[in-house]
Amino acid sequence: MKSPKPSHRRGEVWWVNLDPTVGTEVRKTRPAIIVSPSDMNAALPRVIIAPLTSKSHPLGCRPRVTFEKTDGFILLDQLRSVDKQRLVRPMGSIPEDHWLPVLLEMLS
């Protein structure tokens, strides 16, 4: 019997393998939040993610969050489209009201 496919829903945080990278792109396997719409994620083999970090300088495009008892930032300035094969395992989720308004402001 097949195990169910992961949901890949907007707001979920996953461990994501971001290597290989170029230049100043965020690298290594790290937590990242899925920011692409859930219906798009169900239809495509890719998702759009924003990496999370605990080591950063505050910027307007980097909302502060606490995830798994660690203070950090969502790097909305490092958005990437990644194949779902880069998603290692789910970790939890972050409510949209913590980050979506900042993303919408960036894209307007």
Where are each of the predicted segments found?
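Conserved functional hotspots at enzyme active or ligand-binding sites that engage polyanionic ligands
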Residues: 1-108
